[in-house]
Amino acid sequence: MDFEEMMKELEEIVNRLESEDLSLEESIELFQRGVELYKKCREILQKEQLKIIDVLKELEGDEDDAGRNQEDES
């Protein structure tokens, strides 16, 4: 299941918990599933955030190298 599918299911769970008259057992099961999905989504987002940080560091390094090359040519 990918991130978007998990988010969609999580939204559906929230909507059901907010709008339906559920038994305590059903509510707890849905809540537990929601927490599970939340943790997986958070993990994915944290991994993607690290990738973005790495890309930005590479970009900064490229800009620093380009600046040094221009200084060397002067």
Swiss-Prot record:
What this protein catalyses is: Exonucleolytic cleavage in either 5'- to 3'- or 3'- to 5'-direction to yield nucleoside 5'-phosphates
Q: Which Gene3D superfamilies match?
A: Exonuclease VII, small subunit (1.10.287.1040)
Look up the record and report any one GO term of the cellular component aspect. exodeoxyribonuclease VII complex
EC nos: 3.1.11.6
Q: Which SUPFAM superfamilies match?
A: XseB-like
Q: Name one GO biological process term.
A: DNA catabolic process
Q: What are the GO MF terms of this UniProt record?
A: exodeoxyribonuclease VII activity
Function in brief: Bidirectionally degrades single-stranded DNA into large acid-insoluble oligonucleotides, which are then degraded further into small acid-soluble oligonucleotides.
Similarity comment: Belongs to the XseB family.
Name of the protein this chain belongs to: Exodeoxyribonuclease 7 small subunit
